[in-house]
Amino acid sequence: MVSATRWETAIEVTPWIAAIAEQVPLFGTDGIRGRVGEHLTAPLAQQVGFWTGQVLRQAGGDRGPVVVGQDSRNSSNMLAMALSSGLAAAGVEVLHLGLCPTPGVAYLTHHSEAIGGVMISASHNPPGDNGIKVFGADGSKLDRQLQAAIEAGLRGQQTSLPATTWGQHYYQPQLADHYQAAIAQSLGQRANLQGLKIVLDLAWGAAALLAPRLFRELGAEVIALHDLPDGNQINVNCGSTHLARLQAAVLEQGADMGFAFDGDADRVLAVDGRGRSVDGDHILFLWGRELEQQQQLPGQAIVTTVMANLGFERAWQAVGGEFVRTAVGDQYVQAEMQARGAMLGGEQSGHILCRHYALTGDGTLTAAHVAALVQASGVSLADLVDQSFRPYPQLLRNVRVEDRDRRCNWQNCAALTQAIAAAETDMGDRGRVLVRASGTEPLLRIMVEAEEAQQVEHWTTHLVQVAESHLL
């Protein structure tokens, strides 16, 4: 660190940033996220960095660096530099990893003397969006109380912590090698994927370099798609939200399986050798059965969200397992897992948390363990999926509702609530409806699932029509 004088005047809370912080909570279900140049700017990132540094110093005993990583978006470097300057102004040293998956930032934060970590990414969002995710010293996502303290600082309502030094910025991309090695070590005696042909869709994102290198070092034959960091194409018609290219490649290459990551690689979905998608529900079921057989799943508990398929729930309960649902968002899953002492949880979308190895969702680690699980089983991933459970037909449709009040308070729409009640009456205990406002995009998400596909299609279409007629 370098000596500083009157450091407290280095970062000034400007009125327009204070106004942004006053309007709505900046932190959503997965950090701060928005359109770059509109909601998310370099001046805002700098002040978020400053107040993040202040809050982490107070929570972490006023010593230790902050680990910063980023995905491949064109705006990520700009925002990382702005945020790092704010951290330095708060008297915090910055260890900048450069391109690194979000779980890599969490891992390196936890396994170092860092007081926190920050990831610049908007996960699965389009290239024009970006975000800021903050982690505590233990590598878990920052709790709501500390997020609120950062927001209070941005509003000019927080007192800064006195200091007499500037922080320094150190570019240390080689630290990500420790994260890669930790994934390999977590496999133990099964760290050998020889004989498996695996297709990886890296989504032009944060895992573009690390994941193929890891799987090749484990002995797998790897076919890599979208495997360069490309800020113009990140998540565009590829990755975990667009599986078609991966499915086609698995079939064309005669591969055993494939894995698709999102832009920051904290989630993953799989494709089996028949080209079928394998979502987070199936991954949780298969990994849960393995952990239970190894007596590493306390209470046979799996924690997931309200989005999990009814077929998954009933199949897990049928084998004696405990099935716990939370609100959507991996931070809610993580909190419930910690409260219950559960070791496995996640989301249908591919955020998988295994507390034997990590405190956050980790797409690369999950993919490696699924591949090792298949290798050890002696049968194909397709066969394992067929032996697990039959999911209920499920449809998820998004309705774009720009008006935040209407979107977040959709329950006030009588026509929509009446339509939902009619659907629930019709399906009884053989189906369900879930309507919720997205925490990361201006979308109202409408999900219907039931034993009969015709019912699902009918009620999904009807509910979308009602929402579009009364909320837009």
Swiss-Prot record:
CDD domains given in the database record: GlmM (cd05802)
Positions with a binding annotation for Mg(2+): 123, 262, 264, 266
Post-translational modification: Activated by phosphorylation.
Biological function: Catalyzes the conversion of glucosamine-6-phosphate to glucosamine-1-phosphate.
Modified residues (Phosphoserine): 123
EC number: 5.4.2.10
Gene name for this UniProt entry: glmM
Protein family per UniProt: Belongs to the phosphohexose mutase family.
Top-level taxon in the UniProt lineage: Bacteria
Catalytic activity: alpha-D-glucosamine 1-phosphate = D-glucosamine 6-phosphate
Transmembrane spans: none
Keyword list, A-Z: Isomerase, Magnesium, Metal-binding, Phosphoprotein
Cellular component GO terms, alphabetical: cytosol
Name of the featured protein: Phosphoglucosamine mutase
GO BP, sorted A to Z: carbohydrate metabolic process; peptidoglycan biosynthetic process; UDP-N-acetylglucosamine biosynthetic process
Enzyme class: isomerase
Cofactor: how bound: Binds 1 Mg(2+) ion per subunit.
Active site positions, chain numbering: 123
